[in-house]
Amino acid sequence: VVMEVRTRDIWSLRPALQFGRSGGRNRASAGFEELNFLGLGMQLSLGYSSDKDRDSRFAAFRAPQIGHARWEFNVVAANNSDGHEYRLGLARPFFALDTRWSAGFDLLDDERREQRYRHGETIDRYLDDQRGFNIQAGWSPGLIGDLTQRFTFGAALEEHRFSAVAPIDGIGTTLLPEDRKLIYPWIGYELIQNRFVVEQNRDQMGRAEDILLGWHASARLGLAAGAFGADRRAWIYKGALSYGDRPNDTQSWLVSSEFSGRYENGGSAGTLSTIDARYDHRFNAFTTTHVRVRGDIGQNLDLDQPLALGGDNGLRGYPYRYANGERSALVTLEQRFYTDWYPFRLFRVGGAVFMDAGRVWGDTPEGPDNLGVLKDIGFGLRLANTRSGLGRVIHIDIAHPLDGGADISKLQFLISTEQSF
């Protein structure tokens, strides 16, 4: 018997010093992360972050496994310049396809100042005081053939209380979203096809990537009513469906869709439907063509639920939340390059050239944007930190907008830390 074992050194304790820029907005953070606290596999992070919206001092702790049990525990606390954020969760998840049961709960207390944007500029501000709670349990017959089915149920609270804020730089509260308090029991279903493939140099560099192909579907339905303490009667629903395939060693594709919203007062409210498709063609071990198409359709969106495109979510050559509306489409063409360059055995180096094109339709409280199709081109560097156990990739991009107003910078410089290439 011949056995080959490959290992990779990971720095569990590391400083976290980051600077980012997208959509013409800077952000920075400093702190440290420990991925193996006390040698027990627990994760601890402390730090400070700052961006245009808020300054934050935060602490987070996560125990992915308590003792020899499969229970996960996590807690987050953040003291922000505009409020606070507290999260607490305990869960025994479906940790494998053959896992038979799950249970857990989570709590949320989040207060923050939110902004609305038009053409990349802040036009409105308000305070969002959010409370959330969810308790759930689930059962599964396990993996039968190549399919796993899971049945879940629980109860949830989703509450948003909105209030006006004092003006900052002359911009305060003009329009205030409507308060919402939804308390409801719910039931859920999930189907997973056991069809995984292992790839490398797809969304990471030099790491094995488990890609789920085949079918994956989930749905959840709940009913809020005054008898439960809600401020309205509403059906709350959400779901997702995806299917992928790899017909040969050089091509793969994945199509996914999601939807969420409410049905109240005889019509839909806060409804958002998304379809996302990607295609990857690998020419060799060092270059891949990546194509992605995404569409979003909103219906009676809540005021605190804006739909926008900009430098922060796909249109890399444009300011933050530049185009706003009720429906959007985005196409990305990207040629990815992977190299063997491994400086100081710290970072794997790659690159990309890209073109983005997007459009937003529909109305806003200030009227339609009517910006038409917005396009940009650019190139960038990718750095994958091999000493981190989190699989993060540093993006350094330069993008040039081909459309838009004369007030837009002709070069957008973007730095971000992402979970994929």
For each of these PLM feature ranges, what is it?
Residues 1-21, 25, 31-33, 47-49, ...:
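Periplasmic polypeptide-binding modules associated with outer-membrane biogenesis and secretion
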Residues 11-15, 26-28, 40-42, 55-57, ...:
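Outer-envelope beta-barrel architecture signal
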Residues 22, 51-53, 80-82, 95, ...:
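Structural signature of outer-membrane beta-barrel domains
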Residues 28-37, 55-68, 86-97, 103-105, ...:
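Feature captures outer-membrane beta-barrel proteins of Gram-negative bacteria and organelles
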Residues 30, 56-61, 85-91, 103-106, ...:
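Outer-membrane beta-barrel translocator domains and adjoining extracellular loop/strand segments
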Residues 62-172:
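Transmembrane beta-barrel wall of Gram-negative outer-membrane proteins
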Residues 216-421:
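C-terminal transmembrane beta-barrel domains of outer membrane proteins
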